Amino acid sequence: MSEKTFLVEIGTEELPPKALRSLAESFAANFTAELDNAGLAHGTVQWFAAPRRLALKVANLAEAQPDREIEKRGPAIAQAFDAEGKPSKAAEGWARGCGITVDQAERLTTDKGEWLLYRAYVKGESTEALLPNMVATSLAKLPIPKLMRWGASDVHFVRPVHTVTLLLGDKVIPATILGIQSDRVIRGHRFMGEPEFTIDNADQYPEILRERGKVIADYEERKAKIKADAEEAARKIGGNADLSESLLEEVASLVEWPVVLTAKFEEKFLAVPSEALVYTMKGDQKYFPVYANDGKLLPNFIFVANIESKDPQQIISGNEKVVRPRLADAEFFFNTDRKKRLEDNLPRLQTVLFQQQLGTLRDKTDRIQALAGWIAEQIGADVNHATRAGLLSKCDLMTNMVFEFTDTQGVMGMHYARHDGEAEDVAVALNEQYQPRFAGDDLPSNPVACALAIADKMDTLAGIFGIGQHPKGDKDPFALRRAALGVLRIIVEKNLNLDLQTLTEEAVRLYGDKLTNASVVDDVIDFMLGRFRAWYQDEGYSVDTIQAVLARRPTRPADFDARMKAVSHFRTLEEASALAAANKRVSNILAKATEPLNDIVHASVLKEAAEIELARHLVVLRDKLQPYFADGRYQEALIELAALRAPVDEFFENVMVNAEEKDIRINRLTLLSKLRELFLQVADISLLQ
């Protein structure tokens, strides 16, 4: 069967830059699934994405589905014919459904009996006939949160569509996709190359688009070119470009023909905190800041044009003129804000609502101040500095700089606090109170910052849960999932001695009578333990290991982490699977027991050698392991408990638990309950698979 290259390109108006990659990758994944479901043999499915196009190129696509044999089993012979050998109604109905008579059916004989059988050969459908619907289906499944309509048609897509190219080898596949008749016409760059041209063969893509249309369709190639050219441009001026992955992705999604240029701004603006300047350059203008080798910001920036200009200096000057007023604004705000102390903004917090039922930002500040001090006392941080940081924590939200450049919240608080002469750990805490902001983000660097960050997040969790506004589905307007995980990460990774029970109770207490949810403490803790589940799954822990620890509901995050590591290590031991199975068996036996058990195992009632030996081991281990459990040395404890495998196996092989004599039966059940209690000091091992 011959093979050809298939090309589909959807030419559009400018696609959303932050969604471009996901659209292209989803298009490729959807179409690959369509090919595989149809049984069409194919080679690599390569995706292309540029601001005004999505495309796929499929190598070595078979021209048709393979012919295949189908078999359809009918009734057993005993049910297919009556005593006189005439076909039954069941047999005739089956044959009619297959398009044959009963006489035309074959016989299938196996060691289990004999059946009627229909066998047929189906010719594979041509690829050309299948492709239009496969493309349409793949596009319809794209993750587009908001669709557009254009013109008078009822067609919906992420952006208006102007061209659809469908080529199998050199042949156009006739189809109407998204309201556009397929053709071999492709549009080039808006301002360079040929605005429109035809492509003769799918193999010419994407090279023909680069040569004639001045468009680099390969997303990764554009991104790599921007990165390499920006690094070289920064090197030429003695610096290093800030090429964050997210901004690289966005810029690569904005240009079809990237041209990297270097511009500058007045050195006087360097007196403004670099974070504000960088916010303007990266956030507003999509520029790459440049830093010297010592980490200081240089008065330069790198940007990417979408055109090769005969006069690049004109483009450079234009971008410098655009950014200058924004930097001047930042300079003005910085100088104006410093004319008063950060603390002077406290009264204005009373005018800003945190949440209608929970009060203003000033109310939140008072709670954070108290909670940060309480946490500092628990973890051995400077209580005075923690309460001071709590008092100032939201003051920068009232400054001109943060009002205009919202992403500078926290960091500007740090700069203004330093200007006011606040303690350094207080200033740093104001910056780090929102950390970690995302997965993998840095944690607060000092104990005061940890206390403030936890206090801020716990106040939000307690308040929002306290009025019954739990996150539902994808809706989490107060970012409670991120807040919960942030608290857990700080406590675990900084090894802080904090208990979620007392921490949540204190956060709730500070709200007074504002909260209406009576179960708020349990709700918050359950929610946070649920975040633990997601965290440890991301870390590669098995679901049943997590379940085994969650079953004990440990509320000290550092303790939870120690149990997780202990159970994970326990699973590597040779004895683990047998002991997990034994724990499961014990759990089932105890669940069925209806008689009250003894407080202790009575040695005088023990009869069999195996139960006497198991009881002896339990007494020895109980005394030995108490310090292990008290110190959280769970891994060592489970290693010791692994020695129970042999006596437990002997017990179940040689001892009848449910003996007829009541005293013996209850004593043996008590023995098993003591065995289970030892393991439950760490986790519910019976849940391990």
Curated annotation (Swiss-Prot):
It is found in: Cytoplasm. Its EC number is 6.1.1.14. It catalyses: tRNA(Gly) + glycine + ATP = glycyl-tRNA(Gly) + AMP + diphosphate. One of its GO terms (biological process) is arginyl-tRNA aminoacylation. It is an enzyme of class 6 (ligase). SUPFAM superfamilies: HD-domain/PDEase-like (SSF109604). The keyword Translocase does not apply. One of its GO terms (molecular function) is ATP binding. InterPro entries: DALR_anticod-bd, Gly-tRNA-synth_bsu, Gly-tRNA-synth_heterodimer. GO terms for cellular component: cytosol. Belongs to the class-II aminoacyl-tRNA synthetase family. NCBIfam families: glyS. This is Glycine--tRNA ligase beta subunit. It comes from Salmonella typhi.
